[in-house]
Amino acid sequence: MTVFTEQKMSLDVDKLNKDIAAFPQVHPITKDMKLTHKGVSRLVMLDRYTFKDTEKITLSEGDFVVLTIKEDPKFPARGLGFIKSIDWETKLASVQVDEEFRHTLEKPEEVETGIVKRSLDVIEKPLEIFYEQIAKRNATGLASVETTEEKRQEWFGKFYQELVNLNFIPAGRVLYGAGAGTEVTYFNCYVMPFVKDSREGISEHRKQVMEIMSRGGGVGTNGSTLRPRNTLAKGVNGKSSGSVSWLDDIAKLTHLVEQGGSRRGRVG
């Protein structure tokens, strides 16, 4: 049962493990798990790399969640807290924000109580609280290519030991995707071919960039092949808006494509 002590709530491991049972990708919490990280490292791990109940099938009062504490079109402030109550009709939840993240609160009542009311759309329930859970999921996914169960177990053990002992830390996209059963990329960054200097070429490039971003990748684009601003576009008797404007258009995709948690696409 979730424990209430004045304004503090604590993680109910037994309940979370029951919820985890509905997700075959996630490994349950065991007593030997200890690594949760601290501060920003913990928030980044929980927000970007853990497996979550994205459909909120198991979300209920007392659950530990990641949420947007302060809305901002470019840099929303994320934090951690516990669900106090849920109104499923209005899709709003009251959340007790962890003390570490209350400095971003602005409304006097929220500052005083530490309790905020937020849309369920900006609340996520992580099922992996310990790094060891992520390591087990990753090791399972990386070993899954082996053709026999014996080999899968062998390589699961090898991968897990390297990961859990922090001898090797995979790229963020591997941490997020390996073993999750989702169609995401394991590569953090992609360098795109030169953009063809035509409407069709730009449209095709933009399409490919969006596809990569939607699967978690960052994209490097070289716009030197695009004609400068005010250059004549003969076919339509008009002028080009220039390479900078087209690159800006591609860069704006980063604000439209979310990649898990609060992570967004990257353009270089």
Q: What is each of the regions a protein language model found here?
A:
Residues 1-268:
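Extended catalytic cores of very large enzyme megasubunits
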